[in-house]
Amino acid sequence: MTMTDPIADMLTRIRNASAVKHDTVDVPASNMKKDIANILLNEGFIKGFDVIEDGKQGILRLQLKYGQSKERVITGIKRISKPGLKVYAKRDEIPRVLGGLGIAIISTSKGITTDKVARKEGVGGEVIAYIW
């Protein structure tokens, strides 16, 4: 059976693994998921990620990050634009997550980026997810 929303599946796996304090989480790899993982790494939400080749599409192994007393770094993660209801934001309507404490991941014409970079470059796009 095919998966209707692979990005939501990735975000749910991260949310669930973080809630039970797993060190790593495996998700099926794709270019879009690699871009999202790279944003999470650059913004300090995960420690790192590896792409494991398995002869098919590959596996993306994310190393989750926790504080000194094992408190979660990712406290919330939410899918915004879904296959049944796409959500777009113009360049002057890009949302702020928790007043700038979180990030919005946006798919723009210049690639997948954060809300801060999209605002700086003056581009809008599809709002994929909020992470805080």
Curated annotation (Swiss-Prot):
<keyword id="KW-0687">Ribonucleoprotein</keyword>
<comment type="subunit">
    <text>Part of the 30S ribosomal subunit. Contacts proteins S5 and S12.</text>
</comment>
<dbReference type="InterPro" id="IPR000630">
    <property type="entry name" value="Ribosomal_uS8"/>
</dbReference>
<protein>
    <recommendedName>
        <fullName>Small ribosomal subunit protein uS8</fullName>
    </recommendedName>
</protein>
<comment type="function">
    <text>One of the primary rRNA binding proteins, it binds directly to 16S rRNA central domain where it helps coordinate assembly of the platform of the 30S subunit.</text>
</comment>
<dbReference type="GO" id="GO:0005840">
    <property type="term" value="C:ribosome"/>
</dbReference>
<dbReference type="Pfam" id="PF00410">
    <property type="entry name" value="Ribosomal_S8"/>
</dbReference>
<keyword id="KW-0694">RNA-binding</keyword>
<dbReference type="GO" id="GO:1990904">
    <property type="term" value="C:ribonucleoprotein complex"/>
</dbReference>
<comment type="similarity">
    <text>Belongs to the universal ribosomal protein uS8 family.</text>
</comment>
<dbReference type="GO" id="GO:0019843">
    <property type="term" value="F:rRNA binding"/>
</dbReference>
<dbReference type="GO" id="GO:0003735">
    <property type="term" value="F:structural constituent of ribosome"/>
</dbReference>
<keyword id="KW-0699">rRNA-binding</keyword>
<dbReference type="InterPro" id="IPR035987">
    <property type="entry name" value="Ribosomal_uS8_sf"/>
</dbReference>
<keyword id="KW-0689">Ribosomal protein</keyword>
<dbReference type="GO" id="GO:0006412">
    <property type="term" value="P:translation"/>
</dbReference>
